[in-house]
Amino acid sequence: MEFVLFSQMSSFFLVSTLLLFLIISHSCHAQNSQQDYLDAHNTARADVGVEPLTWDDQVAAYAQNYASQLAADCNLVHSHGQYGENLAWGSGDFLTAAKAVEMWVNEKQYYAHDSNTCAQGQVCGHYTQVVWRNSVRVGCARVQCNNGGYIVSCNYDPPGNVIGKSPY
């Protein structure tokens, strides 16, 4: 009787553990889907009256390839490629798709649309790329670095942040 009870408890524990693992895995994946990237971007764009971005698999492949190259040391160095680009880094599971875009959009507080400038000593180019009216396609990737952190790369087509031009 004790063996049967132990066996049932072991089976229950195993099934419970597997179920928890699947829920956590799905939750982590669900927080980094194409739709998560699009929703975060398009909410910011709608706030300033800019049309939504669409997902582009070719742009996403570029983002994935470049982010994978950065994974060795996790240094945020821009690719200077054919697309506009935003990069973010975070430790652990903190850096989700939505969190990366939120970090970029939080730069809005430093952007003055009337003068098309950033506040002195501040950065706002990530924000302006997110809301750049002429950028209509996006592709993003999230890669774990060798040091355990994560890099998120989003690329935009056509690129934004054209000097002297307003994003919207």
From Swiss-Prot:
Keyword Chaperone carried by entry: no
Cysteines engaged in disulfide bonds, as pairs: none
Superkingdom to which the source organism belongs: Eukaryota
Main location: other
UniProt source species: Nicotiana tabacum
Family label: Belongs to the CRISP family.
Identification of the protein by name: Pathogenesis-related protein 1C
PROSITE patterns, alphabetized: CRISP_1 (PS01009), CRISP_2 (PS01010)
Alphabetical UniProt keywords: Disulfide bond, Pathogenesis-related protein, Plant defense, Signal, Vacuole
Task of the protein: Probably involved in the defense reaction of plants against pathogens.
Intracellular or extracellular location(s): Vacuole
A single BP term in Gene Ontology: defense response
A Pfam family hit: CAP
Record's GO cellular component terms: extracellular space; vacuole
Protein's UniProt keywords contain Signal: yes
